[in-house]
């Protein structure tokens, strides 16, 4: 089983098509193509969304947390050789849970597991944590376009 470790932002851009300001993961700790991925997003006070999402009490918008989870899950499929250079299209996001505010200075650790991948359609589940506490979670179905 192939395991890809310590993937920096530049290397992430070779796998997924998202770019600043919409690349919402900073680093992938591990990708097991077709199985799982672990990544994180550091919450710098300079993130563009903190200036507009409750400036007096900045927090990462929930939908950007959802996007960060989807980007992490997409690594499991886009890292497969046959999908290199491909893109995804989200078909559904289910059981979305936003349990904890994600604020400047925190690190959102994201773990994604691919549940199935058949005929270009992937399904998986993702959990985002701050420390040991669950901050967000969701299940996704998406289509892969090579």
Regions found by a protein language model. Give the residues of each.
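Conserved positions in beta-strands of structured domains
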Residues: 26-29, 94, 99, 113-115
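Hydrophobic core residues within well-ordered beta-strands of beta-rich domains
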Residues: 22-24, 108, 122
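Beta-strand-rich interaction surfaces with strong enrichment in secreted/lumenal proteins
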Residues: 13, 56-57, 97-100
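Active-site helix/loop of acyl-thioester processing domains in fatty-acid/polyketide metabolism
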Residues: 28, 60-83
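Catalytic strand-loop segment that frames the active site of acyl-thioester-processing enzymes
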Residues: 20-60
């Amino acid at each position: 089983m192939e395991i890809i470790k310590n993937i920096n932002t530049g290397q992430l851009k070779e796998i997924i098509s998202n770019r600043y300001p919409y690349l919402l993961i900073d680093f992938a700790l591990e990708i097991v193509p077709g199985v799982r991925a672990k990544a994180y997003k550091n919450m710098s006070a300079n993130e563009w969304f903190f200036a507009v999402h409750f400036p007096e009490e900045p927090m990462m918008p929930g939908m950007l947390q959802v996007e960060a989870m989807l980007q992490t899950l997409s690594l499991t499929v886009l890292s497969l050789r046959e999908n290199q250079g491909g893109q995804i299209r989200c078909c559904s996001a289910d059981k979305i849970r936003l349990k904890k505010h994600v604020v400047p200075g925190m690190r959102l650790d994201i773990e994604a597991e691919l549940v199935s991948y058949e005929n270009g359609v992937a399904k998986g589940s993702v959990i985002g944590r701050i420390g040991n506490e669950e901050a967000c979670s969701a299940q996704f179905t998406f289509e892969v376009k090579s």
